[in-house]
Amino acid sequence: MSIVSRTVTITISVKKLITYIELRYGMESSTCPFCQSGTLISLAAVFFCHSGMEALLSIVCSLAFFHAGTALSSLLASLPFSFSLSLSSCMPILARISDADGIVSMPGIPLGDMENNLLSCALPDSIRLFIKLFRDSISFWILFNSCMPSLSETNLSIVFCILTTSSLTILNSSSIFSLLLVVCTSACFSSAIVSLSSFNVSLSFFLNSACSASMALRTVSILEN
């Protein structure tokens, strides 16, 4: 099992433990010293690094994305629903770019010149991964923000293992575009699931585990192939 697989596995376990402690004892991440998600995830990553430099990079990336994702979540939560609708208009092109190896022709849907140019580009696997993550997270955020807009201003301290997964992935890429997609993905997932947590705790816990596992498996499969 590679370092990425081990780190993703321990990160999911740590996040589930954090969620259990919060639900069992009624604590929040900001008030429980043992429930600081960014710190625990960073420490967990250290045990699965082969060198001191990898451990340092894991800590820096985890904490950086923890704070960046939390800050951007506040911004996304305050955006009007009209903006989320405009984001949904870019979903088809994101889907085609991320799922296509070349130009894709969909029956009954003509592709414009700009879209053809984008689809004809040979994208690295890491870029395709981030586009998929971005597309999925935008979908979640649009859904929950439209259903429960009044619950968006909630505790934004819960950041999921997608932060660490993304931070480890970004170490293999120097693209600024990839970095921006990581931050947006983390913020969207955080905003969506945190909003849901104040509505239904058990459903939030289930989605947290499902989304974490899904994104982690997708990341590991792409990085190891």
UniProtKB/Swiss-Prot annotation:
Its main location: membrane. The chain crosses the membrane at residues 40-60, 63-83, 151-171, 176-196. It comes from the Eukaryota. GO terms for cellular component: membrane. It is found in: Membrane. Keywords: Membrane, Transmembrane, Transmembrane helix. It is a multi-pass membrane protein. Partially overlaps PEX14. This is Putative uncharacterized protein YGL152C.
